[in-house]
């Protein structure tokens, strides 16, 4: 074992509520994207390399025609203010709190959705703390954790 984090499957359940529902309870509308390594020729992928290197590209998940996600390592030395492209959509205070030139940034995309991608940001000792869609500016960020002293000072969102 080299410390690489493998991704062996996921169960997706998309729920939706509809106008006029009484009671207004979400209903299961699709399970697209679910996969399990070893079933129906699905393969495990890698969530995070033990020793990431800028330029590496690897499969995050693979279920033919269902889940074909790819990760590309963009940087292993991210620090806010150095690369303006990687800063786009990133909350400055969050990046400054967690990244001292040692964060990993990935570009994640699906072979099934050409042109769509997100960037994910990983901090040492914490892991994934931010996901940014540069086109829509949608941001998903860590708001708390209890296993690293840096988490105590996470900026309010």
Task: Show where each model-derived region lies.
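Conserved functional acidic sites
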Residues: 1-157
């Amino acid at each position: 074992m080299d410390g690489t984090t493998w991704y062996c499957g996921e169960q997706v359940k998309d729920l939706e509520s509809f106008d006029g529902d009484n009671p207004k309870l979400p209903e299961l509308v699709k399970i697209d994207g679910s996969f399990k390594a070893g079933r129906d020729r699905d393969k495990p992928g890698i969530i995070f390399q033990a020793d990431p290197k800028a330029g590496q590209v690897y499969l995050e998940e693979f279920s033919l025609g269902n889940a074909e996600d790819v990760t590309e390592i963009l940087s292993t030395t991210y620090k806010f203010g150095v690369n303006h492209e990687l800063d786009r959509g990133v909350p400055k205070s969050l990046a400054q709190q967690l990244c001292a030139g040692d964060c990993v940034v990935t570009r994640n995309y699906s072979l099934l959705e050409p042109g769509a991608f997100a960037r994910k940001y990983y901090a040492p000792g914490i892991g994934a703390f931010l996901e940014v869609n540069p086109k829509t500016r949608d941001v998903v960020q860590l708001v708390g954790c209890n296993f690293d002293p840096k988490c105590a000072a996470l900026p309010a969102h």
